[in-house]
Amino acid sequence: MLRWLTAGESHGPALVAVLEGLPAGVEITTTQIGDALARRRLGYGRGARMSFERDEVRLLGGVRHGLTQGGPIAVEIGNTEWPKWETVMAADPVDPAALTGARGAPLTRPRPGHADLIGMTKYGFDEARPVLERASARETASRVALGRVAAAFLEQAAGVRLVSHVVAIGPVSAPDDADLPTPDDVAALDADPIRCFDAATSAAMVAEIDDAQKAGDTLGGVVEVLAYGLPPGLGSYVQSDRRLDGRLAGVLMGIQAIKGVEVGDGFRTAARRGSAAHDEIERATDGRVRRRTNRAGGVEGGMTNGEVLRVRAAMKPISTVPRALDTIDTATGDAAKAIHQRSDVCAVAPAAVVAEAMVALVLAQALLEKVGGDSVAESARNLTSYLEAIPEQQR
């Protein structure tokens, strides 16, 4: 079974991630992982941290000479800012006198919409520093690193490729009939300041972010992930926890600030009658069985149906609002303004990259459940055997 785990704090020495269960023989390098992490730093409206932060990637285990070895893969992402935080974030006890100053000051004015206050309550902290350090979206760098490894397996074992893009920033949305990007469009998307596939919409999104920044505010939006080349039958209908759409929704909702997920046309289908909500089946001119439309987003009954997988995630505005929302000071109980940590105005573009990584991990997990394999070559052979066994009338 493919599984993953991450550890580390936002301003700690490093983030660490482990991916267990991936077959041997997958081609992957630190450069490829570093490139994926660089994509996570893209996007108009990012904070100052993105301009000087660098992700120092080291593969600590599971990869030799550019090939996975079949054992757990361990990735370390070093924090170039660590020397500035070494005392504040030290693992061992430090002299309280050494914590005087801005970085070491207790954070007792929790931010509305963030994990701060509830995290303090749940874990018994008297300030928010331990909470925000782990709850920070910086942690997603770990998942992007692992997602890049999973994406390499998907492409090499099954020819599956993914792409993500931004479809809305605040009230500005791409047209419903806008063209969908393909994996061949990744470079063009990454060159766009918003990672939006529609140029006119992208320009309007930039203007919306500028307005929010001038107002001392933040913005959310909607991202979409597409997976091309998926075989039918990944996932299952026999138990709720094996349904692929439920698993995708779970990992996407697990991304910081994501508050909603839809597969295919999702919430829009709720306003339609059944005759206009489902994808009719036909035999195409090439002889293959296909759906005339893809309102289901490539998933029916909790399983891939051979069409393009299409999932969206809605991100709320960042909770670190520059103009500071009302809160309380937990040290005194008095009314106060929330703390303002260095933050972004809009982080929807990087959220798309994180969502892409999480979709890759779940799809790799589902593919391995279906075809198995201790090497990527064996997984590919097993997939070919499965596809060849599908009755001709159902292909």
Swiss-Prot record:
Protein name, per record: Chorismate synthase
High-level lineage: Bacteria, Bacillati, Actinomycetota, Actinomycetes, Micrococcales
InterPro entries attached to this UniProt entry: Chorismate_synth (IPR000453), Chorismate_synth_AroC_sf (IPR035904), Chorismate_synthase_CS (IPR020541)
Cofactor dependency: FMNH2
Domain of life: Bacteria
UniProt feature coiled coil, ranges: none
Gene Ontology process terms (BP): amino acid biosynthetic process; aromatic amino acid family biosynthetic process; chorismate biosynthetic process
Family: Belongs to the chorismate synthase family.
Self-association and partners: Homotetramer.
